[in-house]
């Protein structure tokens, strides 16, 4: 029949997006309608046209079809209602869609499912729940396509009470074993942070797909329950279910968070052998793991994959690449990655500046910061958090003051305790302890970092009493010290020879503050006793501590013996330090000085031979001073400066002043460090 032929032709045209020709065919079909059969064909043709209007986003054409349906009196026909609801929902005209459903007599859940799914897609979760309640009130029973959207809405709105109501209706329905419904239930309880119910639902499922496994693994991951997540991942792997890239990323990210960096890289390597391959998230996880363990070779491999996949242009990937190279001390490649992009974001600028700052490349970091300003970017809290610690480490007071002014001019930094702590540290490490205290007094909130910087600053100035008073103020304020704070206090006691105070803190640090002494704390005690001349006690500390002494610990004891003229313990410390074959050339100078003082010339010759064989060479010492005209650099033995004739007599005077105030006599037999190095060279 001609009508059937036109109907088939219309369906073909509509499904292939030829809307204009489909409408022409529809007009011909209407002219041919003269029986009940042809009316039915017209009805289904209108339904096909509405679907085509959705596909090609032809709103006005769809409205014309709707108008025809109204004029024909078939607007609420069971064939057309779902199509009309789909049409209006596709254009986010949900009121029109719901009005059509409400005015129809259809008791099938399909049109409601379409409306509810559209609400959920547009994140109108309150409307999802309202539509579901209206649907149930009309006596329409939900089906397996209704529940997932409603459960998602309950989870997103954290409507625990109604979520349980919906769950209850599922339990008494035939859909309690539906794969999609169970997956939605697990996801909802994940949002409710109810791991118990989520896991029970998962365990009772007869059928599980990748979504099921991902949902419950993600539940555990979101709660930081990584051992359970890892266990389920292994079970998923052995069950034969295809592991999606999302699951790989969740588990490898979990390894990263729990400190299992090698495990994270192992998972990333396994991903490369599967069809999932690496996506940008996986690459970022892998690069972060590489940066944390210094695996630059694998980092370069991931970089190559990023280039091959065109992911290296993604901002987050590029920033992580810069960080990886910086952490692996390969600033050349970090800068190459940075320079490859013409327009860098503020995050990218922060990444490269942070890389140079962490490696104490102050000149390069300052130059990059100036470049960033010229490019029109203003430093944010992350920029300042990178630069200020560098200013503190190199005692760059001038730059610290400039950043202080920058912070003061911007109210947005008022409550950034981390930045104010960094400023306190800059002033303290630059010797401006009064200014550091003034900055801390103006802070709205102080924490253990604030007090640690002040204690360390006063300790280095020889103000051990003030440092102890600050420590008491800190603990009385309810601020709990950490292990770094205790190191600062012990160091302050050491510099001021407050032996009894240091002993008391060391004895009670675990029982009173819950801080177990680590190697740093024991080394501080060695320094405390050594500076005070209690060398036997310092030796006992090393003998009895539960850690293997580091080169720095032996050097501390050795230097104390050198100062106080105790060659017996000094020779013992020198031998122990020499056994470690340290890379620090200054340690060999200490050892050589001790053997020279003890008259052990054969040992001294042995030290010289070891230094020569290992190629140990001490770089000339250098320092700099910040003046109004900029930084002036001083190097050992440098006479090129026009001020050298004035500088060296002043330096000799300062050296003598330090010796006079040190409280001990200089052994005239021993050579200076530089003289010994010249003899060994």
From Swiss-Prot:
GO biological process: RNA modification
Region (Type E(+) motif): 629-659
Repeat positions for PPR: 108-142, 143-177, 178-208, 209-243, 244-278, 279-313, 314-344, 345-379, 380-414, 416-446, 447-481, 482-517, 518-548
Region (Type E motif): 553-628
PROSITE patterns hit by this protein: PPR (PS51375)
Keyword field: Repeat
GO molecular function per UniProt: RNA binding
Entries under Pfam families matching the protein: E_motif, PPR, PPR_2
TM stretches of this protein: none
Organism domain of life: Eukaryota
Record NCBIfam families: PPR
Protein family (similarity comment): Belongs to the PPR family. PCMP-E subfamily.
Protein's UniProt name: Pentatricopeptide repeat-containing protein At1g71490
Organism placement in taxonomy: Eukaryota, Viridiplantae, Streptophyta, Embryophyta, Tracheophyta
């Amino acid at each position: 029949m001609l009508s059937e032929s036109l109907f088939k032709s219309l369906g073909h045209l509509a499904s292939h997006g030829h809307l204009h020709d489909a409408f022409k065919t529809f007009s011909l079909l209407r002219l041919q309608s003269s029986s009940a059969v042809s009316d039915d064909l017209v009805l289904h043709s209108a339904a096909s046209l509405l679907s085509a209007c959705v596909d090609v986003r032809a709103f006005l054409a769809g409205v014309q079809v709707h108008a025809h349906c109204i004029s024909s009196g078939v607007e609420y026909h069971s064939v057309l209602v779902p199509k009309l609801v789909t049409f209006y929902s596709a254009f986010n005209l949900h009121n029109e869609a719901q009005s059509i459903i409400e005015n129809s007599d259809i008791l099938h859940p399909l049109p409601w499912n379409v409306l509810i799914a559209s609400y959920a897609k547009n994140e109108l979760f309150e409307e999802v729940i309202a539509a579901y309640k209206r649907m149930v009130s009309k006596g329409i029973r939900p089906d397996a396509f209704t529940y997932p959207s409603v459960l998602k809405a309950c989870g997103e709105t954290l409507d625990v009470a109604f979520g349980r109501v919906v769950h209850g209706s599922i339990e008494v329905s035939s859909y309690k074993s539906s794969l999609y419904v169970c997956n939605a239930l697990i996801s909802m309880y994940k949002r409710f942070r109810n791991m118990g119910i989520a896991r029970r639902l998962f365990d009772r499922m007869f059928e599980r797909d990748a979504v099921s496994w991902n949902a419950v693994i993600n539940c555990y991951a979101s709660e930081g329950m990584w051992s359970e997540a890892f266990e389920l991942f292994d079970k998923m792997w052995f069950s034969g279910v295809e592991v999606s890239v999302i699951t790989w990323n969740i588990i490898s990210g979990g390894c990263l968070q729990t400190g299992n960096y090698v495990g994270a890289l192992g998972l990333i390597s396994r991903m490369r052998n599967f069809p999932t391959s690496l996506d940008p998230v996986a690459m970022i996880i892998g690069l972060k793991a590489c940066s944390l363990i210094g695996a630059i070779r694998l980092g370069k491999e991931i970089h190559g994959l990023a280039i091959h996949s065109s992911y290296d242009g993604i901002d987050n990937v590029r920033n992580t690449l810069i960080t990886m190279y910086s952490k692996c001390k390969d600033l050349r490649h970090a800068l190459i990655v940075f320079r490859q992009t013409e327009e860098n974001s503020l995050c990218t600028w922060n990444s490269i500046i942070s890389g140079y700052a962490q490696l104490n490349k102050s000149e390069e970091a300052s130059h990059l910061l100036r470049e960033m300003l010229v490019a029109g970017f203003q430093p944010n809290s992350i920029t300042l958090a990178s630069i200020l610690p560098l200013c503190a480490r190199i005692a760059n007071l001038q730059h610290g003051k400039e950043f202080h002014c920058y912070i003061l001019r911007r109210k947005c930094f008022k409550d950034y305790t981390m930045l104010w702590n960094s400023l306190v540290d800059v002033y303290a490490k630059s010797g401006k302890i009064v200014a550091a205290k003034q900055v801390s007094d103006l802070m709205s909130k102080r924490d253990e970092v604030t007090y640690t910087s002040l204690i360390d600053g006063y300790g280095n100035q020889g103000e051990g009493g003030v440092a102890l008073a600050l420590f008491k103020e800190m603990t009385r304020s309810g601020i709990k010290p950490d292990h770094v704070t205790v190191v600062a206090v012990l160091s302050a006691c050491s510099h001021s020879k407050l032996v009894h105070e240091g002993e008391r803190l060391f004895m009670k640090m675990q029982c009173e503050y819950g801080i177990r002494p680590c190697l740093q704390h024991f080394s501080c005690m060695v320094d405390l006793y050594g500076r005070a001349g209690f060398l036997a006690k310092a030796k006992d500390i090393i003998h009895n501590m539960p850690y293997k002494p580091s080169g720095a610990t032996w050097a501390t004891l050795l230097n104390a013996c050198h100062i106080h003229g105790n060659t017996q313990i000094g020779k013992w410390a020198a031998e122990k330090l020499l056994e470690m074959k340290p890379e620090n050339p200054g340690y060999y100078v200490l050892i050589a000085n001790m053997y020279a003082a003890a008259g052990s010339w054969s040992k001294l010759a042995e030290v010289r031979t070891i230094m020569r064989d290992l190629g140990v060479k001490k770089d000339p010492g250098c320092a700099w001073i910040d003046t109004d005209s900029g930084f002036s650099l001083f190097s050992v033995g440098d006479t090129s400066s026009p001020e050298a004739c004035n500088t060296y007599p002043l330096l000799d005077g300062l050296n003598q002043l330090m010796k006079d105030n040190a409280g001990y006599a200089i052994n005239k037999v021993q050579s200076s460090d530089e003289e010994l190095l010249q003899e060994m060279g």
